[in-house]
């Protein structure tokens, strides 16, 4: 049984989540759907839905706040929903129990500014908020972000869905709502976090400037461009095809990573992905002892080995 069918049968249908699905194909048939937005080249603009069904369990549930509220009702009800026990209280309690300790450092100091402890349960981040256990998880895909949080002791849960990717507003708005519900003093959580967020943005910009400044001008590729064309393979990511088209190299890597290569320095090329959500990347080619192209390094996606040409 597929993951999609299992969720529909065991979760969506029993909870009455009639507008919830797990694929972009199903979502695209609806007339009442938000358009995703993302900052692309510094400007907020609509972006296309990305088909990520192959990693569906990592973040492919399409829903609305009414449906998601039913999920939280079941969580806060110890597995019971409208008088029926859909999951045992012991099972849910185990998912809300710390399994892995998380060091509160780096970005976590922004997301959880007052937390005294942090851990990960089974699909939930766990920390403390105003002296009570906070159970929550956020996530994002291109142009969309979600935040689902609850404080079981206070019997309160919150769902915030946005059609803007990369925003931290849902996290801080959640805290603001919890404060109001529990009668706590009002705090502008986002304003307090802003200096740290800006500092991280400056670090990112500085790293990018450093990379640009490291370019060695006046260099040329070791070989003719046609020698770099071919198929390269990664056991994890599959094939990337480098082609010579009209005197320029292009890269084809799945449905989203397609772009034109521009010489950077030596045997390194900058690739400008046509899907501007992905920005730019680098491809560093390596030669073997015979002076032939042996592999290409694609940064975070790792090394791809040259596939011998068919004779």
Residues covered by each model-derived region:
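Short, solvent-exposed turn/loop segments enriched in Gly/Ser/Thr/Pro and often Arg
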Residues: 22-31
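Catalytic loop of the DD-peptidase/beta-lactamase superfamily, centered on the K-T-G motif
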Residues: 2-3, 8-16, 22, 35, ...
């Amino acid at each position: 049984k597929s993951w999609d069918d299992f969720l529909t049968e065991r979760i969506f249908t029993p909870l009455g989540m009639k507008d919830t699905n797990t694929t972009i194909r199903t979502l695209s048939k609806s007339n009442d759907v938000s358009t995703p937005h993302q900052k692309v080249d510094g400007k907020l603009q609509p972006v296309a839905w990305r088909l990520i069904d192959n990693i569906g369990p990592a973040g492919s549930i399409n829903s609305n706040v009414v449906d998601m509220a039913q999920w939280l009702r079941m969580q806060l009800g110890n597995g019971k929903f409208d008088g029926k026990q859909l999951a045992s209280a012991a099972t849910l309690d185990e998912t809300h129990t710390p399994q892995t300790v998380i060091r509160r450092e780096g970005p976590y100091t922004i997301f959880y500014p007052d937390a005294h402890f942090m851990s990960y349960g089974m699909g939930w981040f766990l920390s403390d908020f105003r002296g009570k256990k906070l159970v929550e998880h956020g996530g994002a895909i291109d142009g969309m972000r979600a935040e689902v949080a609850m404080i079981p002791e206070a019997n309160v849960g919150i769902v915030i869905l946005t059609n803007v990717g990369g925003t931290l507003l849902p996290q801080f708005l959640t805290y603001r709502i919890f404060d109001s519900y529990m009668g706590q003093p009002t705090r502008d959580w986002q304003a307090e976090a802003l200096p740290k967020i800006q500092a991280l943005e400056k670090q990112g910009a500085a790293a990018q400037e450093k990379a640009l400044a490291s370019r060695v001008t006046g260099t040329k590729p070791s070989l003719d461009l046609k020698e770099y064309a071919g198929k390269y393979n990664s056991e994890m990511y599959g094939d990337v095809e480098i082609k010579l088209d009209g005197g320029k190299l292009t890269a084809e890597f799945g449905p989203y990573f397609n772009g034109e290569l521009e010489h950077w320095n030596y045997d390194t090329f900058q690739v400008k992905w046509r899907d501007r959500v992905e920005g730019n990347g680098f491809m560093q080619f390596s030669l073997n002892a015979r002076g032939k192209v042996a592999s290409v390094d694609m940064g975070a996606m790792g090394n791809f080995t040259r596939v011998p040409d068919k004779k």
